[in-house]
């Protein structure tokens, strides 16, 4: 292939190889290869010249080969575990995430996918509410860690002081809004509407919703919005939402049940409390969970968010950033919504004498 200048390139029937591009442009094969993977060490003018010539010549990188070669270049050979990715948590204890129902599933999914992609996922604790994030940020930089997954956070956490200019980041959940990063979360509004619609199909008419105020804030009121919309779309009696500031106090829940007289309740953490109050489920009250854990499948009706899948896709998104050398805050962050699945379970039953809508 003859190339005298980038403007003189004629697109051949077959795209050129990187060695042909290098020979035609008078640069080394290594320079072309590094420019095509957007290596920041290549001079900008040289990189732009190579990229323009490659585009005009019809060159297209194979994304699978590109990903594989990035792994090989980082370690010198292909290994089952390679570049370290941080999994950042900020709960009250360093190991709290290991027993947290959804966060532990996020980690398992991300860890499995990281190994499949040749990375090694390692947990880092930012301190309670992120109070120790600056120190951890220095550790990440010193170890050359280029990517991190941020676990779900609350709205009132300390500002995370990380080296955002040298870190590719994906945050799990709707709560992290401190800086513009790519995020992935379950589609909470759709999950709520799906729950409500299925309960209506079972014949429930007075469907209530119980939520903790911190959960409502963390997901930016998306469950609340979905519940109010579902009442309008799917009908049924309009009950007052029960918001509480305590996961422990059951008497306010008892009072709400007595006042509103629901025949079904949508929630998450409230199911054990209903059992403590000796509410007969499903005979007296139907219950649908907005977040069924894997261990609860077959025990509860409601939405299975598949948190392991969310963790895996978070790792996919992060790997893409690393392969493209996108290690800084994006100008326009993306929000990926994952759909949940309705799961039948023994906590609901068809209501006698009532037709489904």
Give the positions of each predicted feature.
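An alpha-beta-alpha
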Residues: 195-234, 327-349
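Hydrophobic alpha-helical segments within soluble ligand-binding/sensing domains
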Residues: 182-209, 249-254, 304-326
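Periplasmic-binding protein-like
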Residues: 86-87, 144-152, 206-211, 242-243, ...
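N-terminal helix-turn-helix DNA-binding module of bacterial transcription factors
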Residues: 1-77, 357
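Amphipathic helical "hinge" segments at domain boundaries
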Residues: 12, 59-136, 213, 225-229
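Flexible loop/turn connectors
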Residues: 254-357
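Short beta-strand elements in bilobed, periplasmic/extracellular small-molecule ligand-binding domains
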Residues: 114-127, 179, 208-210, 221-249
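Flexible loop/hinge segments that line or gate small-molecule binding clefts
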Residues: 151-191, 289-301
């Amino acid at each position: 292939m003859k190339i005298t200048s980038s403007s003189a390139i004629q697109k051949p029937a077959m795209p050129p190889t990187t060695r042909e591009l290098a020979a035609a442009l008078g640069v080394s094969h290594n320079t072309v290869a590094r420019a095509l993977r957007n290596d920041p060490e290549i001079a900008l003018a040289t990189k732009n010249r190579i990229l323009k010539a490659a585009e005009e010549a019809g060159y297209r990188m194979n994304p699978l080969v590109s990903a594989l070669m990035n792994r090989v270049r980082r370690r010198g050979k292909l290994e089952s575990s390679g570049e370290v990715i941080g999994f950042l948590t900020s709960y009250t204890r360093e190991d709290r995430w290991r027993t947290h129902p959804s966060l532990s599933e996020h980690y398992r999914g991300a860890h499995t996918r990281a190994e499949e992609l040749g990375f090694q996922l390692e947990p880092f604790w930012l301190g309670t509410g992120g109070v120790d994030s600056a120190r951890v940020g220095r550790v990440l930089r010193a170890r050359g860690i280029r990517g991190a997954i941020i676990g779900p956070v609350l709205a009132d956490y300390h500002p995370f002081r990380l080296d955002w200019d040298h870190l590719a980041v994906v945050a799990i959940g709707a709560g992290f809004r401190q800086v513009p990063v790519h995020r992935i979360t379950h589609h909470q509004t759709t999950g709520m509407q799906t729950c409500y619609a299925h309960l209506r199909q079972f014949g429930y008419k007075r469907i209530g919703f119980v939520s903790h105020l911190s959960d409502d804030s963390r997901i930016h009121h998306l469950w609340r919005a979905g519940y109010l919309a579902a009442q309008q779309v799917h009908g049924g009696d309009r009950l007052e939402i029960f918001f509480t500031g305590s996961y422990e106090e059951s008497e306010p829940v008892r009072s709400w049940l007595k006042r509103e007289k629901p025949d079904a309740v949508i929630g998450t953490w409230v199911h054990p409390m209903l059992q403590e109050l000796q509410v007969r489920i499903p005979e007296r009250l139907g219950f649908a969970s907005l977040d069924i854990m894997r261990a609860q499948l077959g025990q509860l009706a409601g939405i299975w968010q598949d948190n392991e899948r969310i963790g895996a896709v978070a790792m996919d998104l992060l790997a893409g950033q690393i392969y493209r050398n996108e290690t800084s805050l994006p100008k326009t962050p993306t929000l990926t919504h994952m759909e949940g699945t309705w799961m039948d379970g023994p906590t609901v039953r068809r209501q006698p004498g009532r037709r489904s809508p």
